Regions:
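Short, well-ordered amphipathic alpha-helices
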Residues: 15-20, 73-80
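C-terminal tail/extension regions appended to the core domain(s) of diverse proteins
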Residues: 82-160
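Conserved catalytic cores of phosphodiester-cleaving nucleases, focusing on short active-site segments
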Residues: 15, 56-60, 72
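Active-site-adjacent loop/helix micro-motif of nuclease/hydrolase catalytic cores
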Residues: 25-30, 63-75, 86, 100-103
Length: 160
């Protein structure tokens, strides 16, 4: 209510991805893994009466001013603190063209899994063409450290 009236600020993920629960027949398709005597509390079993599992949280930020970067971190920390079970994938998608701003989020404290850029390969090419050594080094560090990836990698990374 306070957020709606303008006296507070609501921070929530832009996209959430849930993983549906599995029937025992799906889990036991190749061999017997679960039955009525074992895995009685496993969250992934539909027969245990749970709800879909939070698989991923995606924060979409067109650009990365410092307050937007902080919002992404706040979203992540809220999920981490309030989760039950495994930690979901927590990612940020952005179009930010400034490597130092990308680094401010991607090199953070580990609350964000990875930052995905909507045109990373083009950004790297342009930064190299401009010849900014620091910017090239920053991007290379982020990419080699698997802290920054192209948006095309996101679906496969979330499939795990």
């Amino acid at each position: 209510m306070a957020a709606a009236l303008g006296n507070d600020y609501l921070v929530a993920p832009d996209v959430v991805v849930y993983r549906d629960l599995y029937e025992d027949s799906e889990i036991n398709a190749d061999q017997l893994i679960v039955d009525d005597e074992i895995c009685k509390m496993a969250d992934i079993r539909k027969s245990n009466g749970g709800k879909p599992v939070l698989h991923a949280s995606v924060s979409a930020k067109y650009t990365m001013r410092s307050d937007r970067a902080q919002n992404s971190r706040t979203e992540a920390l809220n999920l981490i603190r309030n989760r039950k079970g495994h930690l979901p994938h927590i990612v940020v998608v952005t179009a930010e063209p400034m490597p130092n701003r990308l680094a401010s989020l991607a090199l953070g404290t580990g609350d964000i899994d990875c930052v995905y850029h909507f045109a990373l390969y083009e950004l790297i090419r342009v930064v190299k063409e401009v010849g900014s050594e620091d910017a090239v080094e920053t991007l290379e560090t982020l990419v080699q450290g698997k802290r920054l990836k192209d948006i095309s990698d996101l679906p496969l990374d979330l499939s795990v």
